[in-house]
Structure formats: structure tokens, C-alpha cells
């Protein structure tokens, strides 16, 4: 948890001080830029009703932006923590329970067809969620709605 707070603090601190001599690897996404990404993502929908873009990949962690207009397949990451920062829209995070149709992909990554049981947490713009490694989770979106979020994936240690 401390590492997550340090990463989030670093990201927020970076937003305060943007200078020409910023260190290698520094990144700042202004709210106006994220709104532009939010507007573009729905134009590039995949068959699973989602669109995603990698904002930055630093090797051991990465930032992605995702748009969904339908329920996502459940997933689980054995060694990755997901931090979700909702940008727009609304949805529900379903986590825990039993993953039905669970199959391994690679490196401790699991996908399923649905989750039975578990907890449901309504999400909206401005919400931030920490999903621990090893927890089944899925994003649910009501018909006619969408959810867009920035996803920070960091290794669990």
C-alpha cells in the first residue's frame, strides 16, 4: 500500500512542477489531454466493447486508458495490482466470488466468462480503486452507458 501511495504522490507532484529539465521518464497528463483521449477511445472499439490505449510503459509499471460500453470479462492477475482512476461515465466493479470459465493466459494472468457472487461497488468519475493481486474482478456497464478509466498496473511485492 505504501508503494502505491508513493507512486500516486509522485504522479500528483509531477503535475505541480513541469519544467524543461524534467528527469527521463517523467510524464504529465493534463485533464484536457485525458478528455481528448476519452473522446477518441470510443472511435476504436474492439469486439469486446472496449477500447484501450497505453499512455506510458515504464517496464515494471504502466498507465493505460480504457473505455468500456458493456460488461468486461472477469480477470485476475496473480502478481499485478490494478489501480483504477475513473475519468468519466459510470459502472460497477464486481470483485471476488467464483470465476466461471477460468482459463490461464500467460504469466499468472487469468480470464473468465463471468463472476458468480462477490462484492459490487458502484463507480463514477473521480473514484479511485485499488484492486489487490489475486482478486477476481470485472467492470460492469449498464446498457447505454460507458465508463472510462486510467489504469495503473504495478507489480505486487
Labelled PLM ranges:
Residues 78-98, 105-114:
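Short, conserved beta-strand element in jelly-roll/cupin
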Residues 6-15, 19:
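Bacterial N-terminal signal peptides
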Residues 122-127, 133-157:
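Ligand-binding loop in jelly-roll beta-barrel domains
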Residues 1-4:
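Positively charged n-region of N-terminal signal peptides that target proteins for export
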Amino acid at each position: 500500500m505504501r508503494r502505491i501511495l508513493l507512486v500516486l504522490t509522485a504522479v500528483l507532484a509531477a503535475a505541480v512542477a513541469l519544467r524543461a529539465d524534467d528527469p527521463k521518464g517523467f510524464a504529465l497528463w493534463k485533464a484536457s489531454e485525458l478528455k481528448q483521449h476519452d473522446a477518441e477511445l470510443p472511435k476504436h472499439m474492439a469486439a469486446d466493447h472496449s477500447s484501450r490505449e497505453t499512455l506510458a510503459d515504464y517496464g515494471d509499471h504502466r498507465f493505460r486508458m480504457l473505455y468500456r460500453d458493456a460488461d468486461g470479462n472477469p480477470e485476475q492477475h496473480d502478481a499485478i495490482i490494478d489501480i483504477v482512476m475513473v475519468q468519466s461515465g459510470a459502472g460497477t466493479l464486481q470483485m471476488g466470488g467464483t470465476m466461471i470459465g477460468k482459463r490461464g493466459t500467460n504469466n499468472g494472468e487469468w480470464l473468465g466468462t463471468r463472476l458468480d457472487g462477490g462484492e459490487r461497488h458502484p463507480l463514477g468519475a473521480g473514484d479511485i480503486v485499488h484492486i489487490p493481486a489475486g482478486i477476481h474482478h470485472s467492470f460492469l456497464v449498464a446498457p447505454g452507458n460507458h465508463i472510462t478509466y486510467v489504469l495503473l498496473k504495478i507489480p505486487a511485492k
